């Protein structure tokens, strides 16, 4: 019994230390980007020595992968649910943008880091698991599908190809990383709704 209790304690301590490192990595990655981040900087932020960080993670890319995994999974899962809901394209686009901003708020700053670093870029992809790469692309594809649906129904009129427009929408949301902080004057949903109205005012087909 004592041995089992000790093993449980060891597992709990191991998990807690990993979480401490992952939490410390967020602000370091946000400040420096993946390229400018070092294990030394993460260790300083966590109040640990470099050797301790290396004990838990093989390199900064392993930290990066784990730090963003849950947020990316939640974001894509949320967008999948919205894509299946019985909504008109304008409402689906609005709810998709809300879903993205809510996920950004809950997983701040990890999700911003993922998209800022260029999900789908060759440099980043070499250090990500295939499921993360696919998830980043899936998020844009779901926005694109909503745009195509709106064009098909006659509700949207675009001056850009749907794929480019989807990148514009995601890029606009990503840009909020320059100024958005959780619990600020504007909530994630406030921002999403305001941006959606701005977007829709430019693409919704108006009746003459």
Q: Residue spans of the language-model regions?
A:
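N-terminal intrinsically disordered/low-complexity leader segments
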Residues: 1-16, 207-208
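Short hydrophobic clusters on alpha-helical segments that form packing/core surfaces
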Residues: 17, 21-29, 100, 199
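Generic hydrophobic, amphipathic alpha-helix propensity
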Residues: 17-25, 42, 67-71, 75, ...
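Helix-turn-helix
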Residues: 20, 28-62, 66
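Hydrophobic alpha-helical connector segments
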Residues: 66, 80-109, 162, 166-169
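Hydrophobic alpha-helical bundle segments that form small-molecule/ligand-binding pockets
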Residues: 84-86, 125, 136-165, 180-183, ...
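All-alpha amphipathic helical-bundle segments outside canonical DNA-binding/catalytic cores
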Residues: 90-94, 130-135, 152-168, 186-193
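Short secondary-structure transition hinges
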Residues: 102, 106-144, 155
């Amino acid at each position: 019994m004592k041995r089992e209790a000790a093993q449980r304690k060891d597992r709990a301590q191991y998990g807690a230390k990993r979480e401490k490192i992952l939490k410390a990595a967020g602000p370091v990655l946000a400040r420096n980007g993946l390229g400018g981040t070092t294990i030394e900087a993460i260790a300083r932020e966590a109040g640990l020595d470099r050797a301790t960080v290396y004990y838990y993670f093989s390199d900064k890319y392993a930290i990066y992968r784990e730090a963003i995994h849950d947020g990316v999974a939640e974001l894509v899962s949320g967008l999948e649910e919205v894509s299946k809901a019985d909504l008109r394209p304008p409402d689906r686009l609005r709810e998709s943008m809300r879903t993205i901003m809510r996920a950004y708020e809950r997983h701040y700053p990890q999700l911003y880091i993922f998209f800022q670093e260029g999900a789908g870029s060759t440099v980043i992809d070499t250090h990500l698991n295939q499921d993360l790469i696919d998830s980043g692309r899936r998020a844009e594809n779901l926005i694109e599908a909503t745009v195509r649906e709106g064009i098909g129904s006659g509700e949207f009129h675009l001056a850009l190809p749907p794929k480019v427009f989807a990148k514009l929408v995601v890029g606009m949301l990503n840009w909020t990383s320059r100024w958005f902080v959780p619990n600020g004057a504007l909530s994630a949903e406030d921002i999403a709704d305001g941006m959606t109205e701005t977007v829709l005012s430019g693409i919704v087909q108006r009746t003459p």
